[in-house]
């Protein structure tokens, strides 16, 4: 084999090893992002909800700041209920990792009938939240507010 070919092969192997260490985005969170953007007709990226108020994004505490933050609080509670279901009691059936089937048609989100009990429950949590997000006012001042004012979500 030509030395240049060996060098290219080595570079590919090294880059693949590096990429293998990058954790993938949990599939159900990717589903949730798609449902959000379906329900709001693509008017706002799902990332805009990743760190909003006291409950949108990782964790959550305190009093929700507005209707949108209340949507996230309800969604957090729904995931908590999903984790209590016997059908969802192992790691890969966690709401954060369990991918489900859905359809999006002109802003209407539908969880499909081929989901098992756990997937159907998680899909309905995400569907309800996505519809709630689409109907709530987005207050720009509440984006990343917990980082701007760490006393607000006590």
From Swiss-Prot:
One of its GO terms (cellular component) is extracellular region. Its main location: secreted. GO terms for biological process: arachidonate secretion; fatty acid biosynthetic process; lipid catabolic process; phospholipid metabolic process; positive regulation of fibroblast proliferation. Its EC number is 3.1.1.4. One of its GO terms (molecular function) is calcium ion binding. The active site is at 75, 126. It is found in: Secreted. It comes from the Eukaryota. Ca(2+) binds at residues 57, 59, 76. Binds 1 Ca(2+) ion. Its cofactor is Ca(2+). This is Phospholipase A2 OS1. It comes from Oxyuranus scutellatus scutellatus (Australian taipan).
């Amino acid at each position: 084999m030509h030395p240049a070919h060996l060098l290219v092969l080595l570079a590919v192997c090294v880059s693949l090893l590096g990429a293998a260490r990058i954790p993938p985005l949990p599939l159900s969170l990717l589903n949730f992002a798609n449902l959000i953007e379906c329900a709001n007709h693509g008017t706002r990226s799902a990332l805009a909800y990743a760190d909003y108020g006291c409950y949108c994004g990782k964790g959550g505490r305190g009093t929700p700041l507005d209707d949108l933050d209340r949507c996230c609080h309800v969604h957090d509670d729904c995931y908590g209920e999903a984790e209590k279901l016997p059908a969802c009691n192992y790691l890969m059936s966690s709401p954060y990792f369990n991918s489900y089937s859905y359809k999006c048609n002109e802003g209407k989100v539908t969880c499909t009938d081929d989901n098992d009990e756990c997937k159907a429950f998680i899909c309905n949590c995400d569907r309800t939240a996505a519809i709630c997000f689409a109907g709530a006012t987005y207050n720009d001042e509440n984006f990343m507010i917990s980082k701007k004012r760490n006393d607000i979500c006590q």
